Amino acid sequence: MLNWDDEPKTESKAATQNGPAPVNVDDKRVINGETDINQLAPFKYPWAWEYFMNANKNHWTPLDVNMAQDVHDYHHRLNPAEKHVYENVLAYLTTSDILAMRNIGLAVMEKMSAPELQIYQARQVYEESMHTWAYQHCIETLNLDQSEIYNRYRVVPEIHGKIRMANRRLDAAMRPDMNLRNPDDLQEFVMSYLFFAAVFEGAWFYNGFSPIFALQRRGLMRGTGEQLQYILRDEAMHFSFGLKVVNQILEEENITLDPKAVREMWDESEAAETAYANYILRDPILGYSAEYHSEQFRFVANRRARTVGLEEPFPGAKNVSPWLDEQATLRKEKNFFETRVIEYQTGAQLEW
């Protein structure tokens, strides 16, 4: 029987003394680190652990939201232009969140060399799958043609254009032969991650829910709007974390991004977003138009650029949707008899 008072065997002592050296926190790095990826602490990046802890305060599921009124609104209150907006926003989002899930899980997470970063990213992968469930739940609840909605990204050029651009830029980080000690590969990876954090999640997602929020603000599709509010809160943490990681990599690896490549990223993403806005809002809805959507994208892009120390790509862009930030920070009080009470916290206040 094991006696805890017994001294360890001599060979065990020797094995311990001759084993790997303890992890020195100063040796940890975001990428290209050589410390033990299986040892969580000591933390080099305590902020990453805070993101993980805060994310776990934000738990929700699509089944927490009452969608009964949405069924009535969609079939009896929305006009054709509003249905066009609603369906195509969902068509874009259904594919995008799966793309986001795969990018984090297959391309980014495995390149991190500090476990506190990976642990939050594992939570992020879970949240992206939850978001995909939310879109599917909306589609099922309204009895929409799933095959038709899901295939729109293949047949609608304006939706396909955004997905194609995202695939091209994100696939670069999934190359099996990528060597982050090679300056060219490192630049390519950081540009891919910058696109993901600043554009894909930080601008396209962040701004992309706005057309449905515009319906929600008029008392339409409030259940869907509430689902998207919860998703937006998750996404706000995602892109905030991603931009923080990008900043950390730039500092640790002492690299400067290619200004031409950065400019091309902004211009290409704006062109894709403008084409998308012109399609989904070809007929403006009350209180929201394609011009409104595109201008807000430019304003949001400026904010993301400033976060990583880049010049504003679209100087003078106006904040035409000041209510958008409120959607990511609003605490919701629910009537117990209408839906399950959800105290959706953000934990600590984060700066976007």
Task: Locate each region found by the language model.
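Catalytic cores of phosphodiester-bond-cleaving enzymes
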Residues: 2, 15, 71
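Amphipathic alpha-helical packing elements
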Residues: 15-68
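A short alpha-helix capping/helix-coil boundary motif
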Residues: 13-15, 114-115
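Non-heme di-metal
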Residues: 69-352
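Extended acidic low-complexity intrinsically disordered regions
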Residues: 1-11, 351-352
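Short linear interaction motif-like sites in intrinsically disordered regions of transcription factors
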Residues: 5, 48-50, 61, 205, ...
